[in-house]
Amino acid sequence: MHEVFSLSYDPVQRHLAIEKLVVREGLEGQEKKYYRVRPARWYGGIVTADCVGCGLLCKFCWVSDKVMNRPVEVGKFYTPYEVAHGLVSLAKKRGLRQLRVSGGEPTIGKSHLLQLLDRLEREGCRFVLETNGILIAYDESYADELSKYDFVHVRVSLKGCNEEEFAMLTGAKSDGFTLQLKALQNLIDAGV
């Protein structure tokens, strides 16, 4: 019997490797790379800060290859304060009350995300956290820390309906699907 050569990757390890490229320590805390802040029609109107970098390579991803495949070259590093200011300023200008980080995986750079949420907590907005869940499964404390923010709505974007579909859609090892389910359980257990 011949063994089939596989190019699949470990989704956790890829997230951690991407994090080294798109997150750095700055004078005011963790800085993360972003490439734009924009209004969007989703959720009845929302302001989105598009970050750089994701640990998955989904075949259907809407992010341009020019962004997805060039995390070192694309975007600029911003502090949580700068991202919060950009989101809130545009939301006020547009009369919107919902905010999110998208364009990449928002859970990459945990300290940055939590500091961003700290900055947004008193703004009277709703924050939609769209995530693949991989790092929420990997880091047992992530869901507990997110539970401190009652204005955050977490949406785990499942990549397929089973391990086989996950592997087919992302190119990652199939057990990544189990990590997505574990993330959901961690969030439920934390009351998120």
Regions found by a protein language model. Name each.
Residues 1-55, 59, 63-72:
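N-terminal [4Fe-4S]-dependent radical SAM core
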Residues 26-38, 60, 76-78, 93, ...:
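Residue-level signal for well-ordered alpha-helical segments
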Residues 46, 72-75, 105, 172:
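Pocket-edge positions in alpha/beta enzyme catalytic cores
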Residues 49, 58-61, 83, 87, ...:
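Generic structural hydrophobic/aromatic packing signal, biased to beta-strands
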Residues 49, 78, 111:
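Conserved active-site and cofactor/substrate-binding residues in soluble primary-metabolism enzymes
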Residues 59-62, 70-74, 111-113, 139-141:
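Short, conserved acidic/polar surface loops in the N-terminal third of protein domains
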Residues 65-99:
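Conserved alpha-helical substructure of the radical SAM core
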Residues 88-98, 103-192:
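Conserved AdoMet/S-adenosylmethionine-binding subsite of the radical SAM
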